[in-house]
Amino acid sequence: MQIFVKTLTGKTITLEVEPSDTIENVKAKIQDKEGIPPDQQRLIFAGKQLEDGRTLSDYNIQKESTLHLVLRLRGG
């Protein structure tokens, strides 16, 4: 299924995923497309931050859902 990931810059990334994919998997796919290390990615859906060990179906994320990607920058 396809889902969309919207970044803070307003860019939308399209990903091909399965409902059984973990959030960790999704972050890896984002890394493949965008080169952003998973440890800097925070994914938000329906106002909730998604945890790495959970699956898309755990959060009831279905086809054509839009997740929001927030970058956690190190340091500071």
UniProtKB/Swiss-Prot annotation:
The record marks 54, 72 as: Interacts with activating enzyme. Its main location: cytoplasm. Keywords: Cytoplasm, Isopeptide bond, Nucleus, Ubl conjugation. The keyword Transcription does not apply. There is a cross-link at residue 76 (Glycyl lysine isopeptide (Gly-Lys) (interchain with K-? in acceptor proteins)). It is found in: Cytoplasm; Nucleus. The keyword Nucleus applies. GO terms for cellular component: cytoplasm; nucleus. CDD domains: Ubl_ubiquitin. The record marks 68 as: Essential for function. InterPro entries: Ubiquitin-like_dom (IPR000626), Ubiquitin-like_domsf (IPR029071), Ubiquitin_CS (IPR019954), Ubiquitin_dom (IPR019956), Ubiquitin_ubiquitin-like (IPR050158). Ubiquitin Exists either covalently attached to another protein, or free (unanchored). When covalently bound, it is conjugated to target proteins via an isopeptide bond either as a monomer (monoubiquitin), a polymer linked via different Lys residues of the ubiquitin (polyubiquitin chains) or a linear polymer linked via the initiator Met of the ubiquitin (linear polyubiquitin chains). Belongs to the ubiquitin family. Ubiquitin is synthesized as a polyubiquitin precursor with exact head to tail repeats, the number of repeats differ between species. In some species there is a final amino-acid after the last repeat. Some ubiquitin genes contain a single copy of ubiquitin fused to a ribosomal protein (either eL40 or eS31). This is Ubiquitin. It comes from Oryctolagus cuniculus.
